[in-house]
Curated annotation (Swiss-Prot):
Its cofactor is Mo-bis(molybdopterin guanine dinucleotide). It is found in: Periplasm. It comes from the Bacteria. Its main location: periplasm. It comes from Haemophilus influenzae (strain ATCC 51907 / DSM 11121 / KW20 / Rd). Disulfide bonds: none annotated. Reduces trimethylamine-N-oxide (TMAO) into trimethylamine; an anaerobic reaction coupled to energy-yielding reactions. It catalyses: trimethylamine + 2 Fe(III)-[cytochrome c] + H2O = trimethylamine N-oxide + 2 Fe(II)-[cytochrome c] + 3 H(+). This is Trimethylamine-N-oxide reductase. GO terms for molecular function: electron transfer activity; molybdenum ion binding; molybdopterin cofactor binding; trimethylamine-N-oxide reductase (cytochrome c) activity. SUPFAM superfamilies: ADC-like, Formate dehydrogenase/DMSO reductase, domains 1-3.
Length: 825
C-alpha cells in the first residue's frame, strides 16, 4: 500500500465509515435521528452519550448491544477513533475473568519469575484473586515496608473524574501505608525538568497564546517536530477537537506554515505546508545555525535580550565559537542536520522579518540530551524578540490537547484524589503522592539495580528495592524503551499485579490479572479541552460490565475492605454521589462566574454535553504578555525573574551532559553517527489510528497494517539499496533487539531515516529462549535505547537510535499477540 497519499486514503476511508453517512452525528443527528427515526419494525434502539480521550461519542445500542458509534459533536476533521466502541467492548482480546499465572498460583511470591510472559494461566474466582492480591501486598509491606511496592502505574488509562485507574490505585496504596511512585512522564521527560530552570514553569502543559491572536497577528507558524493532526485527535481528558479547525483557518488565510520534521507528517500534507526535512535528533544544530545567522547579520533583538533574559552573553560566546573554537554557522549546522545552509539563512531572515510563532513538539526532546531542544527553542525565540507579542514567540503545547483554543468561562469539575479523606488536598496528574519516587523512565534500571545511586535535577536518588509491582491502566511493555531489558527487569519483583481490559503485552507479563471495565461500562464525567475547558461531558454507562469485568473503583473498594480501610477509601459515597459532588464543584465555580448550569440531575438526564463560551479576554490572551508589559511587576519564577538563557543553577550542578546554557552534544546514536552495521536512524512518531497502544487491537488496524505488521516508512533510495519493495515484510534490528514490520516505501521520510510508529503491541517469538527474541508485530521500543536524557532530567530517549533493515526471507511467523494466551483447561 502506497503511503504518499496517506491523507487521501484516510479521507476515502472516513467517507465510507463516517456516522454522518450512516445518519448519525449529534449536530447532524446522532442523538436525535437514530432514536427518533427508527422504523417500527426495528427492535428497541437508544443512543447514549459518553466520552473518551478521543472526544464525545454517541453510541447506538440495540437489544442491549452496541451496534454503532461516532461523534456526538461533529469534528472539523473526522475522527475514526470514535467509531470502534463495539470493538473495545466485545473484543476477543479482553480479559474476561480473574486470571493467575500457573506457576505463581502454585507458589505465590516464590515462583519462577522467568516464566512471566510464557506460562499458562489459571482462571480463579474474584474472591480468590482479591485475597491473593491482598495477601501478597500485605506480605511485601510487612517485610519490606512501603518502599517495596511500586504503584506509579504510568499510562493513559481512560479519561474520567472518578474512574481514573492510576489515581484509584494510589488512593488505595496511600490508605494502606504508602508506595513508591515516580517523577515525570514519557511525553515530556526532559522538557518538564529543564523548563522551570529557564522559564520558571513546567511550560509543556500550559495554555498557549490564543489561536484568535495567532490568526490575527502571526505571519508564519512553524511546526517543529509536531504533528497536531495526529496528536490533537486525543486529549488527557477529552479532546475538544477545535485546534485543527484553527490550523485550517490559518491555512485558508494564505499565510505560511512550515513543518520541520524528518517525516512529511499527516499535518504537513493536510495543510499543504512547506516541509523542511531534517535529520533525526539534529534540531539543536539547526536552531544554532539560525541563531548564528541572526547574530552575524545583526538581526537578533538586543533590547529584548537585555531587558527580558539573563545570561545571553555567555551563550553568545558559545554560539560564536569563542569557548570551543567552533562557530555554529549555517554551514556547520547544514553538515549535521541535512538542511542546506542557504535554507537555514533564509529561515533566519524570514523569522526576523515576520511575526513568527515557533510551535515546538515533544518528540525532539525524547532523545539523548533532550533538555537542549526546548531550551534552544526558547533561546531562539528570545533572540527574535517576539515573546509576549500577539502571534509571536514560542509555544510548546499547540499540538497537544488543542492548546491555544481560548479558555472558556464556566466551571471545572472535580475529581477523585490519591489522598483519601482530603489529606494533602487535590493533586494534579503530575503530582506525586508517594513516600518515595524515582524518574519514571528509569523503571527497568530501578528493578534491575536496587540501591544504585543516580543524579536527578541536582539531587542524588537511591533506587528502592521493589518486591511488588501493581499497574492499572498502562502498558509499559509497549511504551518503555529496550523491551528486552524490561523483560529481565520484570523478572526481579516477587509479584506483578495488573488491572487490565485486554490481554496486552503488560498483562501477559504479570502474575495476577484482574479484568477491568472499559469506560463504556460505567458512569463518569469529564471535561472537553484540557486548556479550553469548554464542555462538561457525561460519560454514561452504555452497557453493563461485560464478562466478569469490574470497575477499577470497585476492585480497590474490595481490596480496601480486606485491608480494613473501606470507609476511608470510599468516604461513604456511591458512584453517582461522587459524580454529583464533582459536578457541583463546576456548578459552584460557574455560579461565581455568573454562568448558568443546570442541576446535576437535569444535566445527567439530558444526555448531552454542556458547553461554555470563552470571553473576549481569553480570545486575546497572549502567553508572557504580562511579563513583556512589565517584567518587574510580573517576573518569571526563575532566580533572575527573567528567561534564563544561561542558568547558574544548572551550571552549578556540574553535569557533563547538561551545561549551563543550551548546546549541541552529539549522542552516541543518531543520523550523523551511523555505522556500517547500523546505517539508518530510527524515529518513533505517534500513530494516527491509535492512542499509543490503545485501540491497537481494534478493526482500525486493518487500515494501516502492512502485511499484518506495523508499517515502517522508508525512503525509496534506502529501500532500493536493500531490494525492498512496498508491502514487503522486513526485519529491523539494532544492538538491542529485532522486529518484523511491513515496508511502506515513501518519499515522505528523509533519506537515511526510517519511521516506525510507537504503540504496536510487543509480540515476542520464543520468549525466554533468546536474548533478543524477534517481535513479530513491530514494537518500536524493542529497538530503542533505555538511556536517560541526561543527569538533569533522566527522561526517555528513544529517538537517538540507529538500526539496519533488510527484506525478510522465508515464511513470516504469525502475529499472535491479539489472541488469548494459553490457559489451563
Amino acid at each position: 500500500m502506497k503511503k504518499n497519499n496517506v491523507n487521501e486514503q484516510r479521507r476515502d476511508f472516513l467517507k465510507k465509515t463516517s456516522l454522518g453517512v450512516a445518519g448519525s452525528a449529534l449536530s447532524g443527528g446522532m442523538v436525535g435521528v437514530v432514536s427518533k427515526s427508527a422504523v417500527a419494525k426495528e427492535a428497541e434502539m437508544k443512543t447514549v452519550v459518553t466520552a473518551a480521550h478521543w472526544g464525545s461519542i454517541g453510541v447506538v445500542v440495540q437489544d442491549g448491544k452496541v451496534v454503532k458509534s461516532g461523534p456526538a459533536i461533529e469534528p472539523a476533521v473526522p475522527n475514526e477513533l470514535q467509531t470502534v466502541v463495539a470493538d473495545q467492548l466485545y473484543s476477543e482480546r479482553r480479559v474476561k475473568c480473574p486470571m493467575v499465572r500457573k506457576g505463581f498460583l502454585a507458589n505465590p511470591g516464590k515462583s519462577d519469575t522467568t516464566m512471566r510472559g510464557r506460562d499458562e494461566w489459571v482462571r480463579v474466582s474474584w474472591d480468590e484473586a482479591l485475597d491473593l492480591v491482598h495477601n501478597q501486598l500485605k506480605r511485601v509491606r510487612d517485610e519490606h515496608g512501603s518502599t517495596g511496592i511500586f504503584a506509579g502505574s504510568y499510562g493513559w488509562f481512560s479519561c474520567g473524574s472518578l474512574h481514573a485507574s492510576r489515581t484509584l490505585l494510589q488512593r488505595y496504596m496511600n490508605a494502606t501505608g504508602g508506595f513508591v511512585g515516580h517523577k515525570g512522564d514519557y511525553s515530556t521527560g526532559a522538557a518538564q525538568v529543564i523548563m522551570p530552570h529557564v522559564l520558571g514553569t513546567i511550560e509543556v502543559y500550559e495554555q498557549q497564546t490564543s489561536w484568535e491572536s495567532i490568526l490575527e497577528s502571526s505571519d508564519i507558524i512553524v511546526l517543529w517536530s509536531a504533528n497536531p493532526l495526529t496528536t490533537m485527535r486525543i486529549a488527557w481528558m477529552s479532546t475538544d477537537q477545535k485546534g485543527i479547525e484553527y490550523f485550517k483557518k490559518f491555512q485558508a488565510s494564505g499565510k505560511r506554515i512550515i513543518c520541520i520534521d524528518p517525516q512529511k507528517s499527516e499535518t504537513c500534507q493536510m495543510l499543504n505546508a512547506e516541509w523542511i526535512p531534517v535529520n533525526t535528533a539534529t534540531d539543536v544544530p539547526l536552531m544554532l545555525g539560525i541563531a548564528h545567522t541572526l547574530v552575524e547579520q545583526g538581526k537578533h533583538d538586543k533590547d529584548f535580550l537585555k531587558k527580558y533574559t539573563s545570561g545571553y552573553a555567555k551563550f553568545e560566546e558559545y554560539l560564536l565559537g569563542k569557548t570551543d573554537g567552533q562557530p555554529k554557522t549555517a554551514e556547520w549546522a547544514a553538515k549535521i542536520c541535512g538542511v542546506p545552509a542557504e535554507t537555514i539563512k533564509q529561515l533566519a531572515a524570514d523569522f526576523a522579518s515576520k511575526r513568527t510563532m515557533l510551535m515546538g513538539g515533544w518528540g525532539m526532546q525524547r532523545q539523548r540530551h533532550g533538555e537542549q531542544t526546548h531550551w534552544m527553542l526558547v533561546t531562539l525565540a528570545s533572540m527574535l524578540g517576539q515573546i509576549g507579542l500577539p502571534g509571536g514567540g514560542f509555544g510548546l503545547s499547540y499540538h497537544y490537547s488543542n492548546g491555544g483554543v481560548p479558555t472558556a468561562t464556566g466551571g471545572i469539575i472535580g475529581s477523585i484524589t490519591a489522598s483519601p479523606s482530603g489529606k494533602a488536598g487535590a493533586k494534579t496528574w503530575l503530582d506525586d503522592t508517594s513516600k518515595s519516587a524515582f524518574p519514571l523512565a528509569r523503571i527497568a534500571d530501578v528493578l534491575l539495580h536496587p540501591g544504585k545511586k543516580i543524579q536527578y535535577n541536582g539531587t542524588e536518588i537511591t533506587y528502592p528495592d521493589i518486591k511488588a509491582v501493581y499497574w492499572a491502566g498502562g502498558n509499559p511493555f509497549v511504551h518503555h524503551q529496550d523491551t528486552n531489558t524490561l523483560v529481565k527487569a520484570f523478572q526481579k519483583p516477587d509479584v506483578v499485579i495488573v488491572n487490565e481490559v485486554n490481554w496486552t503485552p503488560t498483562a501477559r507479563m504479570a502474575d495476577i490479572v484482574l479484568p477491568a471495565t472499559t469506560s463504556y461500562e460505567r458512569n463518569d464525567l469529564t471535561m472537553a479541552g484540557d486548556y479550553s475547558m469548554m464542555s462538561v461531558y457525561p460519560m454514561k454507562q452504555v452497557v453493563p460490565p461485560q464478562f466478569e469485568a469490574k470497575n477499577d473503583y470497585d476492585i480497590f473498594v474490595e481490596l480496601a475492605k480486606r485491608a480494613g480501610v473501606e470507609e476511608q477509601y470510599t468516604e461513604g459515597k456511591t458512584e453517582m454521589e461522587w459524580l454529583e459532588e464533582f459536578y457541583n464543584a463546576a456548578f459552584s465555580a460557574a455560579r461565581a462566574n455568573r454562568v448558568a448550569m443546570p442541576r446535576f440531575d437535569k444535566f445527567w438526564a439530558e444526555n448531552k454535553p454542556l458547553s461554555f463560551e470563552a470571553g473576549e479576554a481569553a480570545k486575546k490572551w497572549v502567553r508572557y504578555g504580562e511579563f513583556r508589559e512589565d517584567p518587574l511587576l510580573n517576573p518569571l519564577g526563575t532566580p533572575s525573574g527573567k528567561i534564563e538563557i544561561f542558568s547558574d543553577v544548572v551550571e552549578k550542578m556540574n553535569y557533563n551532559d547538561c551545561k549551563g546554557h543550551p548546546s549541541w552534544m552529539e549522542p552516541e546514536e543518531f543520523a550523523g553517527n551511523v555505522t556500517e552495521e547500523y546505517p539508518l536512524a530510527l524515529v518513533t512518531p505517534h500513530p494516527y489510528y491509535r492512542l499509543h497502544s490503545q485501540l491497537a487491537h481494534t478493526s482500525l488496524r486493518q487500515k494501516y497494517a502492512v502485511n499484518d505488521r506495523e508499517p515502517v516508512m522508508i525512503h525509496p533510495e534506502d529501500a532500493a539499496a536493500r531490494g525492498i519493495k512496498d508491502g514487503d515484510i522486513v526485519r529491523i534490528h539494532s544492538k538491542r533487539g529485532q522486529v518484523l514490520a511491513g515496508a511502506a516505501v515513501t518519499e515522505n521520510i528523509i533519506k537515511g531515516t526510517v519511521a516506525l510508529h510507537e504503540g504496536a503491541w510487543y509480540d515476542p517469538m520464543y520468549l525466554g529462549e533468546s536474548e533478543k527474541p524477534l517481535c513479530k508485530n513491530g514494537c518500536a521500543n524493542v529497538l530503542t535505547r533505555d538511556e536517560g536524557t541526561s543527569k538533569l532530567a533522566q527522561g526517555n530517549s528513544p529517538n537517538t537510535c540507529i538500526v539496519q533493515i533488510e527484506k525478510f526471507i522465508g515464511v513470516a511467523p504469525e502475529v499472535t499477540v491479539f489472541k488469548q494466551p494459553k490457559q489451563v483447561a
